Amino acid sequence: MTDLKQMLTEHIGEKRDYYPLNQSQIGIYYYCKNHPESVAYNLPSICELPKQKVALSRLSAAIKIALNNHVAFRCKIVDRSSGPVWVLTDRSFDDFEIPVEKVSEEALTEIKNRYAKPFDLFGDLLFRINIYETEKNYSIISDFHHLIYDGSSCSIWFQDIAAAYYNGTVETEEVTMLDFCAYDDAYQKSQAEMDAISYYRDVFQGAKPRTSIPADLEENDLPGDGYCVYCFDKRIDFSKVSAVCNGRVGAFFVGAFAYAAAKYTGTGDAVVYTGNHGRMDERLRHSVGMFVRMLPVYVTIDESFSLTDYLSQVQERLYGGIKHGKCAFAALMQEHKLSIDLSILYQGDFFNHVPFGDIDCPWEALPLHGMDDDFVIMVFKEKEHFKLKVEYRKDKYKLQTVHEFLRAYEETVMTFIGETVSNEGGAV
C-alpha cells in the first residue's frame, strides 16, 4: 500500500527548474489555452471593509505581505515541447502596485459585473487586485486564475491579510503548490493511482456516462451565460437536513441533486459532479494553490430503497471518490466517456462573510461569463434559508427551464426531510 504522507514528505522543499502541472491544473490549462478569451476559470470576488475601522495604507501593505507569503503567486507557466510546466520566479511584491479608485456605489456595481477578464496564461501574473473606495467602504476586488487558486485559497489569503494587518506577520505555508505538483507527479506513477483507476472502473461498469437536462435551444443561438439566484423554502433548515444525513450535509445536497436530475430526465440513474478541497493532509491547511478535485458521483435510483439506503449509497460513492480522488481526471473522463454537465458545490456559510479582526466583512463571488458546464449550482447556507447561486448555458436553456429544474430539486429536498412543498421558495 502506498504511503501517501511519506510520499508528500519526500517532495516538500524539492528544488527543480521546472515543475509539472498537477492533475487538477492540467485540464484547466488546456481549456484556457484553447479558449483564450474565456473567463470560465477566473475566480473574482469582492470583500467590503468599513472605512472607519480600516487604514488604507496598512491594508495595502497587508495585501502585499499576503502575496509574498505564497509560492503560487510567483509562479509562471512555460509551454515546453514536452508540455506546460511551472517556473518559480524570484519576484517580490513589496513594490506591487494596488490601484485605488474612488467610486460611487452605482459605479461599483457595474465594476463588479465586468471585473473578470481573460488572463494571459504565459504572462507574469495570474491575478489582479484593485481597491475601490466608496462613501462607507474599502472594497477589495480580486481575480485569481483557478490554476493558482481555489475556494480554500480564498479563505487562507484573507486570513493572511487580516493577520498581516493586525500583527505584521503571517503563518507560513508548510507545503507549497510546487511541492504538491512534484508529489502529484510521483502519485501518477504509484500503486495508489492504479487502485483509483480500478475503483472507478468498478463504479462505472455498465453505467450511463452522462446525465444532462434536455436543451431548449440550439447551442450558440444566444452567446453567453445565464445567472440566477434561487432561495429554498425557509422550512428547509439546517437542523432538519443534518438529522436526516447524520451531519453530512454536503452529501445530502449532492444526493438530492442526483435524485432530482434522474427524475427530471426520466432515467433510473444519474452522474453528477461535485468538488473536494483536496487538502487531505493537514500540512496543506495553509497552502494556496489549485488543489480541488472534481468528483463524479454515480447513483442508481431504486424506489424500493429507503431514504437511508439511498443516502448511504451517495455517501459511499462520494467518500470513495474522495479516497481515490487523486486519480488523473482527464484520463478518467476519456476512459468512461464522461461529460461534466451537472455540477453542485455545497459551500455552507463559508463564503457569506470573512473575518477581519473583530470585523465581519461581507464577501461575494462575482459573476462569470463563458462557462462550459450546462449547470453549476452552489448551495449557500444563510440565516433563514439555503440559497442557490446558479450559472447555466443560456445558449442551451431558457430561464423558465432552469427554474423548473430548481423547483424539482427543491421538492426533492423537501421530500427528503419530510416536508410538503409550499410557495415559500423560488427565484429572487
Regions found by a protein language model. Give the residues of each.
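Active-site-proximal acidic secondary-structure segment that organizes catalysis
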Residues: D3, P20, S24, Y132-L178, ...
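His-Asp-centered acyl/peptidyl-transfer active-site segments
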Residues: K15-D17, C32-L43, V71-F73, Y187-A196, ...
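AMP-binding/adenylate-forming domain of the ANL superfamily
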Residues: R16-K33, L108-I111, C154-S155, M194, ...
